[in-house]
Regions:
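Conserved class I S-adenosyl-L-methionine
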Residues: 245-254
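C-terminal substrate-binding/active-site "lid" region of AdoMet-derived donor-dependent transferases
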Residues: 328-387
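Class I S-adenosyl-L-methionine
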Residues: 1-106, 266, 273, 296-308
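A contiguous loop/helix-start segment that scaffolds small-molecule binding in enzyme catalytic cores
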Residues: 2-10, 21-25, 67-69, 138-225, ...
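Class I SAM-dependent methyltransferase SAM-binding "motif I" and its flanking Rossmann-like core
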Residues: 75-138, 299, 303-304, 357-378, ...
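Conserved SAM-binding loop of SAM-dependent methyltransferases across substrates and taxa
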Residues: 255-267
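Conserved alpha-helix/loop element of class I SAM-dependent methyltransferases that forms part
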Residues: 227-244
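S-adenosyl-L-methionine
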Residues: 272-314
Length: 393
């Protein structure tokens, strides 16, 4: 078996001094060395150095397949680094990796935190809202930042969302001669002159965590009244049974609340909606929950809008189901995929009863009532009943 042509080398802020002998040998043998400007300088790559293109692309590395090439990355190349991007396109024998201590390991070591109990997030290229589902009293998070100035922005975001009492540590240039760790609270954050690479450690306090169960309060979502109500949504999510990595079609998405909760459970979603104002609400909710990488809005009419979509693992139809929409969905479902349809009109109820008789599954009638003033007393105020059909292909 031939030697790997590509060496993926993790580099710390201590540069060459922090490399072991095997990594040094691999770097010395490379004809071409790829990396960011800072890494190339730390490794003293000289004329062999090639900066990454903007936007980032590994094609220049792959074009040199067979020649001795080294790629430099921060710390562990497989934590928000180039390592995973490269190895996904290479055979196992083509590469060898030499990881160094990553920033999260160094941060945990400085603070004495157990990594297995700490949330580690790369917020250098992701919205701060990605942190929201993880915030709970006493929760600890290590957040990689775009640059030192982003520490102030993240602290301000925490304070704005009710977590101003959280303790935060701005951790700069860990492992190098310019290492610095400074502490504050999110609300009182006034740390200046931060340098990169930077990380903000957070010990959460003071806010209201998101519930972990299905059926989040409607007040958390932007909507125009067209939203699956919390108790019905909880039953709907139970019927959809989201599993990590699965894809949901949310047809007639309204506010996107079902899609949002499906994604919070680890899935992905395509929210199909026709009305522009509701599309705007869904997009606002996607930003609010930091789900830009999991939830995509598809503006269009079903069934036509479904034609180009990838095959789903689950489908939810919250309104507007008719025979044509059902036929389009049913034709695309793979064996084992789930379909959940809710209806409130007599026409939709009749269709669901017919489909249940033909295809089986479970037909459920959901009737809810809330206590409300009735003169000087209280009485039950019923909501419109919802008929829910659940079936597995």
């Amino acid at each position: 078996m031939s030697e790997p042509w590509l060496s993926i080398i993790g580099l710390g802020e201590d540069g060459l001094a922090g490399l072991g002998a095997p990594a040094r040998a691999a770097l010395g043998a490379a004809e071409i060395v790829f990396g960011g400007a800072r890494h190339l300088a730390l490794a003293d790559a000289g004329a062999r150095g090639r900066e990454w293109p903007v936007p980032f692309d590994v094609a220049p590395v792959l074009a040199l397949r067979g020649r001795p090439v080294a790629v430099l990355a921060s710390g562990d190349p497989f934590w928000h680094g180039a390592g995973g991007t490269l190895t996904a396109r290479l055979a196992a024998g083509e590469w060898r990796a030499y990881p160094a201590a990553g920033c999260v390991s160094l941060a945990a070591a400085r603070l004495g935190w157990r990594l297995e109990e700490t949330i580690c997030l790369g917020l250098h290229a992701a919205p701060f809202e990605r942190l929201l589902p993880h915030l709970a009293h006493g929760a600890r998070a290590l957040c990689l930042l775009r640059d030192g100035a982003a520490g102030a922005a993240l602290a301000a975001w925490l304070a704005e969302h009710g977590w101003g009492a959280s303790r935060v540590w701005l951790m700069e240039a860990l492992g190098g001669p310019n290492e610095r760790v400074r502490e504050s609270t999110a609300a009182a954050y006034a740390l200046q002159d931060a340098v990169s690479p930077a990380l903000l450690a957070v010990e959460a306090a003071g806010g209201r965590p998101l519930p972990r169960c299905a059926g989040l309060p409607e007040a958390l979502f932007a909507h125009d009244g067209q939203i699956t109500k919390s108790p019905v949504r909880a039953l709907t999510l139970a019927a959809l049974a989201p599993r990590p990595g699965e894809l949901l079609w949310d047809v007639g998405a309204g506010s996107g609340s079902v899609s949002i909760e499906f994604c919070l459970a680890g899935g992905r979603a395509l929210a199909v909606e026709t009305r522009a104002e509701r599309v705007a609400n869904i997009e606002a909710n996607v930003r609010r929950f930091g789900l830009q990488d999991r939830l995509t809005v598809v503006e269009g009419h079903a069934p036509q809008a479904l034609d180009a979509l990838p095959v789903p693992d689950a489908v939810f139809v919250g309104g507007g189901l008719d025979q044509a929409v059902f036929d389009a969905i049913w034709a695309r479902l793979a064996p084992g995929a789930r379909l959940v349809a809710n209806g409130v009109t007599l026409e939709t109820e009749a269709l669901l009863a017919t489909l249940h008789a033909r295809h089986g599954g479970e037909l459920l009638r959901i009737e809810l009532a809330r206590a409300a003033p009735l003169g000087r007393m209280r009485g039950w105020q019923p909501a419109r009943p919802v008929v829910q059909w659940t079936v597995t292909r």
